[in-house]
């Protein structure tokens, strides 16, 4: 194994920021993995909720793209990428659309909190480029994703109450 040579392009990029970005890459890949699990759960023949499957597959691809964008940033800033093991999703059975959406909301809030902490670190390390990068590519998108999931959860709860009110249980 050869030792990596020092970067020619690294400037004003603190080691703590580099490490935090590597952790964020792992979290984004984990989120992608969870959404992939959800997608293929809803694609099963005994579940057969194709729109949920498509929605979560799209979310999986988005999260993977977020990780790739962070990896590109690491290279642009002269940092090194250190990939870690990706944790298995906490469950394999997502039960129903409402439960999966609630889990997705918790996941997105966790990702958002991690990004806010990363932004705080970048501010403390006086790294305006990293602050701008996080603000431009992540923070608003996270707020929009959290709002979208909240809306889906509200609508699914209303639909469930409507079905139960008519003496029927939704499939």
UniProtKB/Swiss-Prot annotation:
Its EC number is 1.16.3.1. Residues 11-160 form the Ferritin-like diiron domain. SUPFAM superfamilies: Ferritin-like (SSF47240). Pfam families: Ferritin. It catalyses: 4 Fe(2+) + O2 + 4 H(+) = 4 Fe(3+) + 2 H2O. Keywords: Acetylation, Cytoplasm, Cytoplasmic vesicle, Iron, Iron storage, Lysosome, Metal-binding, Oxidoreductase. This is Ferritin heavy chain. The lineage of its organism: Eukaryota, Metazoa, Chordata, Craniata, Vertebrata.
């Amino acid at each position: 194994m050869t030792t990596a040579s020092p970067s020619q392009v690294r400037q004003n990029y603190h080691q703590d920021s580099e490490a935090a970005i590597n952790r964020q890459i792992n979290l984004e890949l984990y989120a992608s993995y969870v959404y992939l699990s959800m997608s293929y759960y809803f694609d099963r023949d005994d579940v057969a909720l194709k729109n949920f499957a498509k929605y979560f597959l799209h979310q999986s691809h988005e999260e993977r793209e977020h990780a790739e964008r962070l990896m590109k940033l690491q290279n642009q800033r002269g940092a090194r990428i250190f990939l870690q093991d990706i944790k298995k999703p906490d469950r394999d059975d997502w039960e129903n659309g409402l439960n999966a959406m609630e889990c997705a909301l918790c996941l997105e809030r966790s990702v958002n909190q991690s990004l806010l902490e990363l932004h705080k670190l970048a501010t403390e390390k006086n790294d305006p480029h990293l602050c701008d990068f996080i603000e431009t590519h992540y923070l608003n998108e996270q707020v929009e994703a959290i709002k979208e999931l909240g809306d889906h959860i509200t609508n699914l709860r209303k639909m469930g109450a409507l079905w139960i009110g008519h003496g029927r249980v939704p499939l």
